[in-house]
């Protein structure tokens, strides 16, 4: 995704809703915890903070979230790590929620996120590194890119997808309900 780098002031963005996401890693891949804000009216996604490290056990992840001051926030964690999410709850992160994933959810999440202008705090160096290196798989026969991201340089991006997943599902339902209202009124959308 295209993005703009700048120093972001959390206080100036405090009127926008916050979203938190966690992608687990360990030895080869880092764990990534991100804080983002969404401005739906202006179609902007702000990436405010990241905590990205390798070799983190769940107790260290919980302590980092507490140290950042987000232990009481709703955090969306990778549902492939239900056991880790439960352990974080036991370690004092009570509002971590398993992200609902299904067929096509990665592409759906990316497509939603691409509708927004990304503004990344320049201190989020790992997120910036991923955005610079994120790429798509190529068809072996045609050498054309296909709608399937390469599974590298994606941990921060996955955490952003998780953080915003429920927001976009809620938006989808609101838009769907609006269309249903128009249909019922005879507008035939």
Residue ranges of model-derived segments:
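Mg2+-dependent endonuclease catalytic cores in nucleic-acid-processing enzymes, primarily RNase H-like
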Residues: 34, 40-151, 170-171, 187-189
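Acidic two-metal-ion nuclease catalytic site recognized across multiple nuclease folds
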Residues: 167-189
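Short beta-strand scaffold segments in enzyme catalytic cores
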Residues: 31-37, 161
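Anionic group-transfer/hydrolysis microenvironments
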Residues: 23-25, 51, 80, 160
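Hydrophobic/aromatic-lined pockets within catalytic cores
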Residues: 26, 38, 164, 168
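Acidic, Mg2+-coordinating catalytic module of metal-dependent nucleases/exonucleases
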Residues: 150-171
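ATPase catalytic-site recognition across NTP-hydrolyzing enzymes
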Residues: 1-25
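Coil-to-beta-strand transition motifs
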Residues: 26-30, 42-43
